[in-house]
Structure formats: structure tokens, C-alpha cells
């Protein structure tokens, strides 16, 4: 049976495959559209399998709400060209629509939903085969509450945020999802920050404070000996500054002795209570930066998010939020 241009065009619209692939599939199936579709699907699955070890760093991130339920999903691919393709964005939207309509709470539930003649996962695999790029679903997260809101940062499908509240407040809700997008908090308040994170931060703060105290003592001792600390702060600088004639070999030897002696003495005699107090202050600063309600309001730098919410509605509470981006931060 001869393959017509009308059949090729029809198959291309149905499958999204290229003209030549459609022609080959129709020729192989003797003009049978359904069989040609299956040939294209199988070929696409084989191509997708070969690309499974590639990195999918680009993609499309979308968010949607339906009453008390809101979700984010990302369909990832390899190139920005595919990520901005209308069919790719439409597929991402269709997947999100299905996920929200079915109130899916896990990515596995989303993948198992029906789409076309198979599942959503199979639809993604089919599209991967057609484009020749690795594709995978990622970033699926949900929030639930009396009122939900979503935000797609600058409409670029790269960063989305969602949040749930105990009651409706459109103005506050919109400002907060923008705040989450801009400031990337890890918790609503201090209670939501895992103890393991707090413990890690306090240890980092303690070690940093100790190092700073030792460094101050070393610099003071070097200056007292008539040596510029910046000239001897590394082996490379010592060599370079000797070549320039800024310091002598004797200066370097003396500096090394001072650095070793003072560092050891200061480290052994650091005031523990002072170190802990400084570290606690740094932990407090960290918690202010990573807790949403403690953050400086991006819309009004003179207030915290908590203060702004209280002004808008004293009874308003944020129950949960999620944020997903394809970009490293």
C-alpha cells in the first residue's frame, strides 16, 4: 500500500515524531496507522533506554492548585531547546492536571496514572524516544489546607512555589509564595528546622569562631613583631613576597615560628563560654535567614514576614510550603 502525505501528516500529529520516522513506520506497517503508532512507540522506548544514563538538567517546572490541594511537578530533559518546546510544556501541564485532578500525593502515583493508551510514565518514555533526549519526572510535591496558592517565578517554568494556609488571604498568600521563591527558606519557623541541621550549624559556628579567635591572636603577634600578616598568610604569598623583596627569609622563618607557637597556645586557651555565646548568636542569625516567618519581608524590608502577616490578618497561619527549581543555588 502506498504511503500518502496525508497519512504521514496524520501520524506526525498523533505521535509527534519526525516526518521521516512517520513515513518509515507507515511503510513498515503497510499503511496501518495504529500499527505505525506502535512501531514508533517501541522505537522510542528503545531510544529512551539507551539514554537512561545521561543527565537531564533542563526541563519544565509547573504548579497548579485546585481548592485545598496544590502541587508542583517537573518534567526534566537534556536541553533548553526541548524544554521550551510547546509540546513538551503541554505534556508537563497535562501530567500536572492529571496529578491534581486525582489528588496524587507521591510521584509513583502520578507515574501510574493513565494517559493515552498507557500510563504517564509510558507517555514520558514515548516522548523521550521521539525527541532523542533523556526525560524524567521529578520534584513532585504537594500541600493541602483551607486555602492554597501557587507561583511560577517570572513565568519561565524554572522555579515554582506552593503554600497552604488556614484561611483565605489572597494578598498575603501571593506575597509569601514570592518570598519563598526569592529567599528559599527551609522551614516555616524554628520548630520546623531539624535538630540535625541545628547541631551541624552550631558546630560549624563553633569551629569558625575558634579559627577566627586564633587568627586574631596570630595577626596581633605578627604585627607586634613588625611583620605584615598579609605578607605571610600562605606559603605561596611568602615565596612571592620574598621574590618581590617585601620580606626576607629571616622574616619568613620568624613568621612561621610565631604562627605555629601562637596558634597552639591560643587554641589551647580559648574561653569556651565566649566561643559558645558567639556560636549561638550565629545560629540565631542562620535561623533568621532560613525560617520563613523570621525572614525580612522582601516587600517591606523593615518588617519580618511574621509581622507582615499579623498586620494583614492576625489569624492567618501558613501551614506548609514547597519550592522546586531546576537551577543550582
Curated annotation (Swiss-Prot):
Compartments it resides in: Cytoplasm
Q: Name one Pfam family in it.
A: EF_TS
On whether Acyltransferase is a keyword of this UniProt record, the answer is no
Q: Which family does it belong to?
A: Belongs to the EF-Ts family.
* Lineage, opening ranks: Bacteria, Pseudomonadati, Bacteroidota, Bacteroidia, Bacteroidales
| A GO cellular component entry from the record | cytoplasm
Q: From the UniProt entry, list the residue stretches annotated as the region Involved in Mg(2+) ion dislocation from EF-Tu.
A: 79-82
Instruction: Return the CDD domains for the record.
Output: UBA_EF-Ts
User: Gene name, please?
Assistant: tsf
Alphabetically sorted, this entry's keywords are: Cytoplasm, Elongation factor, Protein biosynthesis
* Stated role: Associates with the EF-Tu.GDP complex and induces the exchange of GDP to GTP. It remains bound to the aminoacyl-tRNA.EF-Tu.GTP complex up to the GTP hydrolysis stage on the ribosome.
Organism annotation:
Parabacteroides distasonis (strain ATCC 8503 / DSM 20701 / CIP 104284 / JCM 5825 / NCTC 11152)
Write the protein's name. Elongation factor Ts
InterPro entries with a match to the protein in the record: EF-Ts_dimer_sf, Transl_elong_EFTs/EF1B, Transl_elong_EFTs/EF1B_dimer, Transl_elong_Ts_CS, UBA-like_sf
